[in-house]
Amino acid sequence: MGSQPEYGVHAELNVPVETRDGTALATDVYRPADPDTNAPIEESKPALLDRTPYGKRGRMERHGEWYAERGYVVAIQDCRGRFDSEGEYYIFVDEPEDGYDTVEWLADRSYCDGQVGTIGTSYGAWVQSALATQDPPHLEAMFVNQGAANGREATFRHNGTFELRWLCWALTLGGGFAKRALGNSDIQTLLADVDVRDVLADGPIHRGQSPLRHIPNYEEWAFDIMTQGATSDDLWQSPGMNFERHYDGMADVPTVYAGAWYDSYTKATCDNFAALADRKNADQFLLMGPWTHGWNGYPLPSWNKPYSGELAFGEAALRDYQETRLRFFDHYLKGEDSWDDQATVEFFRMGTGDGGRTTEGRLFHGGEWSTADEWPPGDVEHTTYYAHGDGTLSTAEPDSEGGATSYEFDPKDPVPTLGGNCSSYITYEPREENLIEYPLAERNLHDITGRGGFDQRTREDTFGAEPPYGPLEHRDDVLVFRTPPLDEPVEIVGPIRVRIHAETDASDTDFTAKLIEEYPPSEGFPNGFALNLADSICRARYRGYRDEPDFVEPGEVYEFAMEPYPTANIFAAGHRIRLDISSSNFPRFDVNHNTGGPLYGDREYRVATNTVHHSATHPTRIELPVRRA
């Protein structure tokens, strides 16, 4: 149990925090106050900092008040160039120094006892790690919920490809609330009326020809992340974009890295914990639930979400987010024993459910919490499952020297995305009212891809799908390898590795891998349920996680390495483990045009013949982190 509410709240709004370059960052400060008079108390208290690009008012106000009532000073700040803060906005680049300066400013206030902790989700998690690369002297603890690690490898970009969610974000939550849009109703109206689905369907945008042309600084950073793929590009050296390069110098403070199996930052969360637990002396924790990206509760953030996409987990999945964070800070900033029983690693094991159909129409996948001393847990061993020419997947190595399967990959007919580790694939609902009658901040957002676990079959509302709708495995460009029904359960916990041996007749193409649990037909799901657990992609020119592009020679066999995001799941007896291989997953990732042209913005298209090998010489395989019984 954490601190109880015992104070009133005194708020100081739009306090300017001047950074080293003279930019004023607008900050709301919530202080514990006398409950009768609401006058701020004289006693200094530890402070919590939450930096956001989404505006510090609205739901954030109650967020600040909640902690102030429990004895914390809370500073909620608009990031540079957003809402009430001065400066030009370029995504993440200025966050390390701005965060450092704010931590030290806050620690220097008379009402702060010199200890500063940081909180925030998504962008608010990213900026925490960014400021930690600068090692502020008064930073004492961090609760990093669903944040990044290496923007080039698995956030903005992904093994050479581009995660199109950032283009969606630029057109909606980013650009819609840019300073220029907030100050010009015509620009904001134009952005509000954009149907992002049309933008995605029309193919790559071009400079000066999309709605982003009206907010040039947003167009600049959007095209930078879409077109710059090499490690040597200055963008990916920045401590605001790539924390992995700066792990050794990061602040050595107690930190919780929290995330979810269907979050867009799953791999980054686990990577941050594993790397920093090994490097730092301060306590590091990992907490992974079964949820999707973001929080699910207003006005306060919450993990009280018992489902992800078409999956239901039951009440076991519910978690009090605010109380968990409070217990952590009470321990490390107030010296209370509220965190003593917390395991170093706590995670949700999905897959203990009966597979029945819930009243909401979801599949009851179930699950339960588990703990470990390290990540991945010490009782995990990677077990290799090999693809075979007859479509089977087994631990037996291929015994033939030959064996390959070909398909045609048409970039104009990509494989549709059906859920998974998605976020920000969104568009504003169309409205007839103007922005005065119906402000942009109040408009609903439509999800384009879905997020979480989904039966891998298209339907009428699947973006990019065309009739006849049905299982993705029925497509000619999707190769499927599956085990026989399992004789006993198989539990996996940890990182996943895929190695595809393949060739193409193009100078560049993509390969994708998707791990699936196949539920057999049942009364609730007479066609079975192909549950996506994790997926990844590899752009040929960046195969092997290359730092610089290297185009392939048509007809030559290469190994394409991928790391689908970590997970924790129990494959039940009678179910099958399945590996799907293809060359696209759209719009989760941008589509390779197969021409060897520009990394983004190619105007030409080419159908590629891609061949996956599954022989003794060139074994295609997936390595699963199997937990010993």
PLM regions with names:
Residues 191-195, 200-209, 303-629:
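C-terminal, loop-rich substrate-recognition/catalytic regions characterized by aromatic stacking residues
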Residues 267-284:
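Active-site-adjacent alpha-helix of alpha/beta-hydrolase-fold enzymes
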Residues 1-43, 482, 486-488, 548:
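N-terminal cap/lid segment of alpha/beta-hydrolase-fold proteins
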Residues 61, 69, 133-249, 414:
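Accessory cap/linker subdomain of secreted extracellular hydrolases
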Residues 119, 126-195, 261, 280-327:
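A catalytic-pocket lid/entrance helix-loop region that shapes and gates access to the active site
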Residues 33-108, 154-157, 299-312, 473-475, ...:
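Cap/lid segment of the alpha/beta-hydrolase catalytic domain
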Residues 257-259:
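Short beta-strand/loop motif that positions the catalytic acidic residue
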Residues 110-122:
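Alpha/beta-hydrolase fold nucleophile elbow
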